[in-house]
């Protein structure tokens, strides 16, 4: 019983985290500062990171 509940919580948490991040199109970057502008236009937040040469935007909290 507990194993099923833990597995369900793990799946739900993974799905929530997956849908929280979005790619900022095909914007190439070499540093996180280059992602702030494009991510602010998409998500109204500057929460972003340059990963593998592409911008990744994170949604606002709150």
Curated annotation (Swiss-Prot):
Residues 1-24 form the signal peptide. The keyword Disulfide bond applies. It holds the Pfam family Toxin_2. It is found in: Secreted. The record marks 49 as: Pharmacophore, responsible of Kv1 potassium channel pore occlusion. One of its GO terms (cellular component) is extracellular region. Keywords: Amidation, Disulfide bond, Ion channel impairing toxin, Neurotoxin, Potassium channel impairing toxin, Secreted, Signal, Toxin. One of its GO terms (molecular function) is potassium channel regulator activity. Disulfide bonds join 29-50, 35-55, 39-57, 45-60. Expressed by the venom gland. It comes from the Eukaryota. Reversible blocker of voltage-gated potassium channels with fast binding and unbinding kinetics. Has highest activity on human voltage-gated potassium channel Kv1.2/KCNA2 channels (IC(50)=0.11-0.16 nM), whereas its affinity for other channels tested was in the nanomolar range (hKv1.1/KCNA1, IC(50)=253 nM; hKv1.3/KCNA3, IC(50)=91 nM; and hKCa3.1/KCNN4, IC(50)=70 nM). Belongs to the short scorpion toxin superfamily. Potassium channel inhibitor family. Alpha-KTx 06 subfamily. Has the structural arrangement of an alpha-helix connected to antiparallel beta-sheets by disulfide bonds (CS-alpha/beta). This is Potassium channel toxin alpha-KTx 6.21. It comes from Urodacus yaschenkoi (Inland robust scorpion).
């Amino acid at each position: 019983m507990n194993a099923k509940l833990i597995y369900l919580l793990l799946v739900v948490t993974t799905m929530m985290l997956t849908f929280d991040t979005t790619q900022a199109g095909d914007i190439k970057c070499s540093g996180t500062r280059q992602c702030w502008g494009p991510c602010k236009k998409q998500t109204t937040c500057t929460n972003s990171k340059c990963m593998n040469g592409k911008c990744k935007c994170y949604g606002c909290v709150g």
